[in-house]
Curated annotation (Swiss-Prot):
Part of the Bam complex, which is composed of the outer membrane protein BamA, and four lipoproteins BamB, BamC, BamD and BamE. It comes from the Bacteria. Keywords: Cell outer membrane, Membrane, Repeat, Signal, Transmembrane, Transmembrane beta strand. It comes from Serratia proteamaculans (strain 568). Gene3D superfamilies: membrane protein fhac, membrane protein fhac: a member of the omp85/tpsb transporter family. HAMAP family: OM_assembly_BamA. Residues 1-20 form the signal peptide. Residues 24-91, 92-172, 175-263, 266-344, 347-421 form the POTRA domain. InterPro entries: Bac_surfAg_D15 (IPR000184), BamA/TamA_POTRA (IPR010827), D15-like (IPR039910), OM_assembly_BamA (IPR023707), POTRA (IPR034746). This is Outer membrane protein assembly factor BamA. The lineage of its organism: Bacteria, Pseudomonadati, Pseudomonadota, Gammaproteobacteria, Enterobacterales. Belongs to the BamA family. Its main location: membrane. Part of the outer membrane protein assembly complex, which is involved in assembly and insertion of beta-barrel proteins into the outer membrane. Constitutes, with BamD, the core component of the assembly machinery.
Length: 801
């Protein structure tokens, strides 16, 4: 439209000035119709100045130049003697931009696209651009299957040549796939092929991936899936001949027809390697080895190319070119592969840089690097550095880029870009519980103290049954070789009776230190010494507790309370294997920890204690939003030298860190008291059972969890929130328990059985909040026993095992 007016104006001017074809000298330029655009700005855009000799061509160029500014809807140039009169009609200015009816596309995204096209408040309205935007948005809706969608721009005039721009959306409904037909398939049925598609004409209730809503991008992906399916099974001549997508008259249904030619299956006969192998021909030969009579497989060919690139990358050849051309023999249905390799230059690392570590010091990140500056570039070492940074748990994301150094042929810089997360946990709370009464809790845990990598924690708890304080410090790099040093001091005043456990009070304090030794990238060992003083009092006569006191030579009366104190020195040992992909919210890998401690000479007690914890993450889909999580914990402890393990070292289960849905520490053996009349048992029985948990010297806990995408959470917070469905199982038992005629007479259960397994199932939500990790769970016990306590909703601050 604008060009049409330009042409008309030029013709009119030309016809009006035939007599002046030789030109004339401009003595003045006068504008008519300017409102928003200043005269000076308009003059700057004109190729004609006062004093110039102007021809018809100059006038035409002037009109084009003014139209090109985008400020005018119409431009006319007239002559009055030696004065140029420029008549313009300005485009209206956009006063506001609003949207209506858009549900699939957010306002912010629309504004970004409009601004990218030059449509923003304060700018001139270009109707041609608006029409293009309308069409582009409608094309977007068509691509996601909404064929009845429409987008209309409503322009409302305002005073002073301004307008309101409103985009009105009518999105309609997504067209659903009525039928998918594949024509030309003989070796495989339609159901076999379509079952691998994302788009489906039928979606079972359990299929969370399949979708009947048509999307152009998904169809393209499904066609590629179909192609790969055949190529991976030897059909080297497979071809998708055509694809038809038909729309029903009401635009609500889609019929898809895919015409294919399967061809025959082809076998591999040979692999021929050509090019610059950089002296690694033996390794290339190993990577390109094929089995006699093996079917052609497109995915294996791609994997072979990737393996060759990875191998060359280990030796510094960062940008190798590897391509494979299949030589197909239709006569005998065979394929010969020609692999062309160009290793290129060997690259060396000039610098390793870090970005985004505003808190963490460079040295904390640099010590995790396995790629060295000045050495040749090793892709495996660069990736190891990324994995180790992720495993620290200091960062939400870690990305790595390798950039060539300008002006050099063989140097690169490696840049690690991190996004730091809050590595500190601060909590302070006041609460009230039926067991704990008024409760105060405060704590600070910082896993990256002042950016040094030190882990420092101080915590305290005060309620009706416990007063606890602890200070801990760990230096993960006590030596440059990665030997860690950690220490802890604590004080605990614990009244077990008020915590609904077996009746006793224990005032304990202690100190321990630990050295950690890295063995390799994934394995480490720990050793340390510890001291603890346990001051036991108010011990009520209970079978398992008295059994321990008897083994210590105290032989207390079964009708009296008892007191005892013990000082123990322990040798602590541990081993950890860890190849998790990151320190928090992992998606793949395993972490297994074995810990043990044993008392050493000078201790009052003689016992050992072992625990094994293992966690395994298995991603289900490529983007790792669906992950299977398996967890297990085993524990066993026993006395030495004829003594029993102290009962206060027993294992417990139940609660948010073991078997969810059960009360904390309530699973397993219960206290059986002597002299029952004194402790509320009926009928004057000398022994009776209670609901007080006493724990046991053996424990087994397992969990299976399905981690799913969190609904209703934006992508911005996806890395901070995790949702899962779980099933937990666990048991605690006492291998030293012996049922006697007396315990059987009074119906005391056999607590030596490991088969009394509790089971629960539920849903959990974890949130890496600014205050630290928060864990919410709701679980329902499926299998429980007498004396167990249910606790369906549970909340926890801090990491769980």
């Amino acid at each position: 439209m604008a060009m049409k007016k330009l042409l008309i104006a030029s013709l009119l001017f030309g016809s009006a000035t035939v007599y002046g074809a030789d030109g004339f000298v401009v003595k003045d330029i006068h504008f008519e119709g300017l409102q928003r655009v200043a005269v000076g700005a308009a003059l700057l855009n004109m190729p004609v100045r006062v004093g110039d000799t102007v021809t018809d061509d100059d006038i035409s160029n002037t009109i084009r130049a003014l139209f090109a500014t985008g400020n005018f809807e119409d431009v006319r140039v007239l002559r009055d003697g030696n004065t140029l009169i420029v008549q313009v009609k300005e485009r209206p200015t956009i006063a506001s931009i609003t949207f209506s009816g858009n549900k699939s596309v957010k306002d912010d995204m629309l504004k970004q696209n409009l601004e990218a096209s030059g449509v923003r408040v304060g700018e001139a309205l270009d109707r041609t651009t608006i029409s293009s935007i309308e069409k582009g948005l409608e094309d977007f809706y068509y691509s996601v299957g909404k064929y009845s969608a429409s987008v209309k721009a409503v322009v409302t005039p305002l005073p002073r040549n301004r307008v309101d721009l409103k985009l009105v959306f009518t999105e309609g409904v997504s067209a659903k796939i009525q039928q998918i037909n594949i024509v030309g398939n003989h070796a495989f049925t339609n159901d076999e092929l379509i079952s691998r598609f994302q788009l489906r004409d039928e979606v079972p209730w359990w299929n969370v991936v399949g979708d009947r809503k048509y999307q152009k991008q998904k169809l393209a992906g499904d066609l590629e899936t179909l192609r790969s399916f055949y190529l991976d099974r030897g059909y080297a001549r497979f071809n998708i001949d055509s694809t038809q997508v038909s729309l029903t008259p009401d635009k609500k249904g889609i019929y898809i027809t895919i015409n294919i030619t399967e061809g025959e299956q082809y076998k591999l006969t040979d692999v021929v390697v050509n090019g610059n192998l950089a002296g690694h021909s033996a390794e290339v030969a190993q990577l390109t080895k094929i089995e006699p009579g093996e079917l052609y497989n497109g995915s294996k060919v791609t994997k072979m190319e990737d393996n060759i690139k990875t191998m060359l990358g280990r030796y510094g050849y960062a940008y190798p070119r590897v391509s494979t051309q299949p030589e197909i023999n239709d006569a005998d249905k065979t394929v010969k592969l020609h692999v062309n390799i160009d290793a290129g230059n060997r690259f060396y690392v000039r610098r390793i840089k870090f970005e985004g570590n505003d808190t963490s010091k460079d040295s904390v990140l640099r010590r995790e690097m396995r790629q060295m500056e000045g050495a040749w570039l090793g892709n495996a070492q660069v990736e190891q550095g990324k994995e180790r940074l992720n495993r620290l748990g200091y960062f939400e994301t870690v990305d790595v880029e390798t950039q060539r150094v300008p002006g050099t042929a063989d140097q690169v810089d490696v840049t690690y870009k991190v996004k730091e997360r809050n590595t500190g946990t601060f909590n302070f709370g006041v609460g009230y519980g039926t067991e704990s009464g008024v409760s105060f809790q405060a704590g600070v845990q910082q896993d990256n103290w002042l950016g040094t990598g030190y882990s420092v924690g101080i915590s305290g708890t005060k309620n009706d049954y416990q007063t606890y304080t602890e200070l801990s410090v760990t230096n993960p790099y006590f030596t440059v070789d990665g030997v860690s040093l950690g220490g802890r001091i604590f004080y605990n005043d614990f009244k077990a009776d008020d915590a609904d456990l077996s009746d006793y009070t224990n005032k304990s304090y202690g100190i321990d230190g630990t050295l950690g030794f890295p063995i390799n990238e994934n394995n480490s060992l720990r050793t340390g010494l510890g001291y603890v003083h346990n001051g036991l009092s108010n011990m009520q006569p209970q079978i398992a507790m008295w059994r321990y006191l008897d083994s210590m030579g105290l032989n207390p009366n079964t009708t009296d309370r008892a007191s005892y104190s013990a000082d123990d020195f322990t040798l602590n040992l541990g081993w950890t294997y860890n190849n998790l992909d990151r320190g928090y919210f992992p998606t793949s890998g395993n972490r297994t920890t074995l810990n043990g401690k044993v008392t050493i000479p000078g201790s009052d007690n003689e016992y050992y204690k072992l625990t094994l914890d293992s966690v395994q993450y298995v991603p289900i889909n490529d983007d790792r939003t669906w992950v299977l999580l398996g967890r297990g914990r085993l524990g066993y402890a026993d006395g030495l030298g004829g003594k029993e393990m102290p009962f206060y070292e027993n294992f417990y289960a139940g609660g948010s860190s073991t078997v969810r849905g059960f009360g904390s520490n309530t699973i397993g053996p219960k206290a059986a008291y002597y002299n029952s009349n004194s402790y509320g048992c009926s009928n004057g029985t000398p022994i009776c059972n209670s609901d007080d948990a006493v724990g046991g010297n053996a424990m087994a806990v397992a969990s299976m969890e399905l981690i799913t995408p969190t609904p209703f959470i934006s992508e911005k917070y996806a890395n901070s929130v995790r949702t899962s469905l779980f099933m937990d199982a666990g048991t605690v038992w006492d291998t030293n328990w012996q049922n006697t005629a007396q315990t059987s007479m009074y119906d005391i259960p056999d607590y030596s059985k490991a088969s009394n397994i509790r089971v629960s199932a539920g849903i959990a939500l974890q949130w890496m909040s600014p205050l630290g990790p928060l864990v919410f769970s709701y679980a329902n016990p499926i299998k429980k026993y007498e004396g167990d306590k249910s606790e369906q909703f549970q909340f926890n601050i801090g990491k769980t095992w």
